[in-house]
Amino acid sequence: MKLAFMGTPDFSVPVLAEILAAGHEVVAVYSQPPRKAGRGMAEQPSPVHRFAEEHGIPVFTPVSLKGEAEQQAFASLDLDVAVVVAYGLILPKPVLEAPRLGCLNLHASLLPRWRGAAPIQRAIMAGDAETGVMVMQMEEGLDTGPVLLAERVAIAPDETAGGLHDRLSHIGASLMVRALAALSRGGLAAAPQPEEGVTYARKIEKAEARIDWRRPANELDCHIRGLTPFPGAFFEIARGGETIRVKILRAKPVAKSGEPGKVLDAGESIIIACGEGALEISGLQRAGKAAVTARDFLRGFALKPGESVA
């Protein structure tokens, strides 16, 4: 089929790759404009933008699709369908209706649970046992369209947002190719989303990254995994008038107790008491430093039982 692909981050790239491998005619790629990044703060194209250029596909990076000129340019592509995967811009009604078969969106949750910007992180942070990917027919509401295909995925007890992100990206790529094949044959039925069970996966805020040791250890375990690798859950240690920020990369709940935020053990691992239970930390990273094991961290940083962290 003749289509446009609309996406921006790493999550979207495997989907575009699978669509190309399946032999579809991708006549245009839409991605968010280049952003300043890196030490030199030079403008960097998005991962989807780079992939498309490497494969000789025309790339468009409008700051908005609300203008009539952009909408007419999109309509002039004369598409069978548009595929949207983590694009990041709102698609107005004229854009949604321009392709002959509309716009398909790949969403990384079991809708209507976790509509919105951060479904992968929120599913782990909430302690969900499973999530999934869904292909839906887009409409003007936020992730409200009818579902065309879905695949459920179990969340492993030690899975991080980064690991789940990569798994769902590849599962979703295969699902989207299946959806396009069925759509081209006219054999894809749409099922409306249930009205009950709606939750919203709001964007991750910086303030959420600080660990609140008053919470139960099992909740903090989910919280940390949901924020790994980005932005990373952290705590702070006061040292001689200096505040040192430390990210937790790997931890697990253990059956120990103490005053929340107090170090219970600092040997092969670091154990810190929580509101209920404790966290045994095995991987950490100081700001601006490399990731290390707890043992290596303690070689360069004295942290003693009885000390409190914030």
UniProtKB/Swiss-Prot annotation:
Reaction equation(s) it catalyzes: L-methionyl-tRNA(fMet) + (6R)-10-formyltetrahydrofolate = N-formyl-L-methionyl-tRNA(fMet) + (6S)-5,6,7,8-tetrahydrofolate + H(+)
Residue positions binding (6S)-5,6,7,8-tetrahydrofolate: S109, L110, L111, P112
InterPro entries: Fmt, Formyl_trans_C, Formyl_transf_N, Formyl_transf_N_sf, Formyl_transferase-like_C_sf, GART_AS, Met-tRNA-FMT_C, Met-tRNA-FMT_N
UniProt GO molecular function: methionyl-tRNA formyltransferase activity
Record keywords: Protein biosynthesis, Transferase
Gene3D superfamilies referenced in this protein's UniProt entry, alphabetically: 3.40.50.12230
Pfam families xref list: Formyl_trans_C, Formyl_trans_N
EC number of this enzyme: 2.1.2.9
GO terms under cellular component: cytosol
Entry similarity comment: Belongs to the Fmt family.
General function of this protein: Attaches a formyl group to the free amino group of methionyl-tRNA(fMet). The formyl group appears to play a dual role in the initiator identity of N-formylmethionyl-tRNA by promoting its recognition by IF2 and preventing the misappropriation of this tRNA by the elongation apparatus.
Name under which the protein is recorded: Methionyl-tRNA formyltransferase
